[in-house]
Amino acid sequence: MTAPNRNTLWARAIADELAAAGVHAVCVCPGSRSTPLTVAVDAHDDLTVYSHLDERSAAFFALGRGKRTGAPTAVLTTSGTATANLHPAVMEAAQARIPLVVLTADRPPELRGSGANQTVDQEQLYGSAVRYYEDLPEPEVTARKLRSLRTSVCRAVGHTTGPKPGPVHLNVPFRKPLEPVSVPGDVPPSFDDDHPLAAAGRGGDTPFVSVHDGTTEPAGETAAALAAAATTAARPLVVAGPADGGAGITPDAAAALADATGAPIFADPLSGLRFGPHVGDAPVVGGYDGFLAADVPHPEFVLRFGASPTSKPLRKWLAASDARQVVVDPAGGWREAEFTATDVVAADPAATARAIAARADGTRSAWTDAVLDLEARYWAAVDDFQPAATLEGEIAATVAAGAPDPATVFVSNSMPIRDFDRFAAPRGADLAVLGNRGASGIDGVVSSALGAGSATADPVVGLVGDLAYFHDSNGLLALERCGVDATIVLVNNDGGSIFHMLPIEQFDPPFTGQFKTPHGLDFAPTADTYALSFARTDTVGEFRAAYRAALGDAGTHVIEVSTDAEASHRERERLADRVTGLSV
């Protein structure tokens, strides 16, 4: 059907190529200048549209989908300050290597710098954070311009995946009329027949340009040398940090590597390796954040996958070693902020692990057996510990141990992810544990969790702190508007408890007023505002009962656990003192 005007034709071409290139969902925010694109994506049979009222929430929702699927989701806004609200999620996507397509509508070019209403400088708005940027030309009804447009969209989507996934930005200017009204002479009646390729693309689900990603394997001699180094080392180690979007080491490859080299796997909770059916057979270790306080010998050879580990004790322990540390990164990037790594292998992590495993003939070493024994004794010590006050780590442990199999678990930054790292024991359940550890902000956590939940039929569990919940409570609107249910565990310690772990705690003032920032907020009214169930608990026992009940019930449940941040911190220190007595 011939488009009624050039804007409609242009926007339909963009929507067609987004869908054909692999975008399955678009988060749309209301606005006038983006009308042509909103109408086009809403009418497209192969695009699911999620309507959002707040741009920041929409961007994090799209980010969460990308984290869960490894595929790009698009977010669409009008011009002006709406575009700036996407920036935090763009930064997270860039740092965490998560595919994301940003579409910003814009005013005509001559209005830039003119003082025209709702007109700001949107060119290169996100700077170096995006993998690809293009300021698209104004809509024009010529075959070549439309072929160029389709090519640009496909190239942009192609840049969201590959060895270094991440966000891309297409800035799309439109003149009025923005609605799909008929403009005589704008689109010639014969245009579709005269230029079928430009008007309709390649048809079906075939993108105008197919961008093919290749899997880079290490050179044979490199894999052989690494295999020899791993099998001859008395204390080999595999460290798996937070995984990239769709480009991390897989459980089967990690298990094969550990089996062939005899090395244990220190698995970050966000690595994709701490939880899953492979845990029963592979030497997966999760208690290192706690037991490295003991006298643990340093490794001699380390293979590192993923981003820098969440655990500070692990990072410092590795930095203090004289080990050869090999970072395997698909893009050849550097994500090792202690600067003690000795090698970088620019190759696909799973392919590298398999290549090394195929050339290694090691057996499980006495070192690995000792580490696994220490791991077992650490978790026994945690289980036996009787805190004098609510230990927030018990909440994290309960979330991990009690989450359904399968489930998606989204963990907030600050103390929740640190407690999850230290207290969530490896488990054979199929848990997709996610978090925003790229830029490590507390903004957008609720929206990210719900975005991840929108991409799966699995139950969704969120573990958030009070400040993160406050910061993104408007993200709860997605529960009804986007059809997502979740169980949200809200640890309310009335402020920023992480600052108790820093030296500034000793200086009050300004510690309480400027760092801990107690707020005294009552979060129960969010139940009425967002039509959810809210339960307040004061003990770990009460929380466990409420958590079990929520998981067995339909709808969204928020379970608040009231804690004393300082008391919990002291109990964490007391447990650490006990663990210090463990040894290999």
UniProtKB/Swiss-Prot annotation:
Belongs to the TPP enzyme family. MenD subfamily. It comes from the Archaea. One of its GO terms (molecular function) is magnesium ion binding. Pathway: Quinol/quinone metabolism; 1,4-dihydroxy-2-naphthoate biosynthesis; 1,4-dihydroxy-2-naphthoate from chorismate: step 2/7; Quinol/quinone metabolism; menaquinone biosynthesis. InterPro entries: DHS-like_NAD/FAD-binding_dom, MenaQ_synth_MenD, THDP-binding, Thiamin_PyroP_enz_TPP-bd_dom, TPP_enzyme_TPP-bd. It catalyses: isochorismate + 2-oxoglutarate + H(+) = 5-enolpyruvoyl-6-hydroxy-2-succinyl-cyclohex-3-ene-1-carboxylate + CO2. Pfam families: TPP_enzyme_C, TPP_enzyme_N. CDD domains: TPP_PYR_MenD, TPP_SHCHC_synthase. The keyword Manganese applies. Keywords: Magnesium, Manganese, Menaquinone biosynthesis, Metal-binding, Thiamine pyrophosphate, Transferase. Catalyzes the thiamine diphosphate-dependent decarboxylation of 2-oxoglutarate and the subsequent addition of the resulting succinic semialdehyde-thiamine pyrophosphate anion to isochorismate to yield 2-succinyl-5-enolpyruvyl-6-hydroxy-3-cyclohexene-1-carboxylate (SEPHCHC). The keyword Zinc does not apply. This is 2-succinyl-5-enolpyruvyl-6-hydroxy-3-cyclohexene-1-carboxylate synthase. NCBIfam families: menD.
